[in-house]
């Protein structure tokens, strides 16, 4: 059968490296390494899973060429000493056996390092931090610059000896080479600063040294921030100009964008469309006639195919998409596109856990980032009936997982449609990508002949008993938190009133005009939900005020979403009232107490209560009582356990495997 995506599966040769298809796993930190900078075996398995899934080229996350000075993470890989060769060799061996090629990204963090981690003041081109509020770095002396140049060359030779097929030099994203290239962070007045040629000199020396060390047949990739997307930073036109100073020895440009201060474009926010950056790769390719990788929220294989067919890029780079589904390439090649578990670009488990919390990466849609779908190889050893109450993403994960290992599974959902809160929130235009996850889960459930779904059905004790359960999973989700505040319960979500929760707002979403210029919106609650409401109305021209009891709007958000929402609030002039508490609700105003203890009125045309969600357990206590004297185990998961994020519900749904094992079914 002819493949629908011929350009994706066309091999390509770069010097002596032939890549079997055009999908590149782009480098993205994981925190899976050992604390001494060595590859862990978990780490090796992570990359092998993606090679096994059909990926053509894997570019391993950035490895420090000069530790500790050049390291930016507690578990960052190192390639600055021969000690690290054995595990890196094992990595290459593990990837190669599946027919994939492998490169490693070489990096020096510069000012993106932290003194608390490296034990010294970070260094850079100048004494300018890599982001607002960052540490002030120490400008490098010329002899130090030349020392680092040599360290790049030594690291590249070491990579070649490990068995890597290529190296990538990181010259973007606010790391050291980027700090020299950017006029924001390079204020030098010597031969390494000032003009574009001078700012590109460090990159040129690094690339030339790497070529000298690896020889004429070894591919060199360079990752760039083609547009820094910050005031005073390099534009695409600026980048096209400075590339001429070092493009000669570069084989492939990995065309990214953004800096630390514009991280929502570097690690794409979820509203940015598939392939939105491809024009940047096209511009570089056209000017320098070099193969280019394009990146940027590419999840849909048709978008990837169209980019390649149109000549905008030669490779499709995917990072988070392959965290979400290591089998993406195989599923596309063998006609199983509907089975792809698409990344929803929430940035919670990857960027949030790694950058924000310094933890190993996780994934909202993939509860088994390392083990993939291996769990399906084991089936229950005796009959087991599992009843799941609630068809949101947590309940769907539990039901599908139980059915996939052979349980007879019953899913009871009181509404007409499955998907829960994720499906509801995805109706907000900027959140539409979120729908990919419940849609995938619903498709997954539809293929399981031992999973029986009852929609429009409220679970009762008698119904559950009739299904003869061995295990009951309660996943009944959450409802908005509505505290006992004067006027709130009389007005919120009532017909004819102007006060609503986010759920009622979404129900009325088509009633709000596109042009709301001059209308006032007041939002109580500055968390993720309140910010979703803010974005919806500011983009329609409304004047928005946000009220938050805590000292900061967006507390607990991942760094990408935080940066993005801060930029939007600044752009649209959102009034932020922090340390401010709601006292009373009226139909046209909120009465609040400000930080000084004074009472203020906030008038509005539309007011929204976004104080988070609380667990909803309408039948759990009855179920507990009815089965209290039996061997039936009852587990409560997702928001009905405690209102949190989708990621916790997905993981708890997959944990049905542990429940089955505890009862000797597995």
Which residues fall in each region the model found?
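Short acidic active-site motifs
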Residues: 303, 459-463, 645
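A Rossmann-like FAD-binding core segment of flavoenzymes
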Residues: 435-481, 490, 495-519, 539-625
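Glycine-rich dinucleotide-binding loop and its adjacent helix/turn
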Residues: 366-379, 447, 453, 481-540, ...
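A conserved FAD-binding loop/helix module that cradles the flavin
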Residues: 533, 557-558, 637-666
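Short amphipathic alpha-helical segments
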Residues: 37, 71, 305-306, 329-330, ...
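A short helix->loop->beta-strand "cap" motif at the edges of active sites that frequently abuts
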Residues: 100, 218, 290, 469, ...
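Beta1-alpha1 glycine-rich phosphate/pyrophosphate-binding loop at the start
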Residues: 388-452, 456, 481, 526-560, ...
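Flavin-dependent oxidoreductase catalytic cores
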Residues: 1-389, 393, 397-404, 408-409, ...
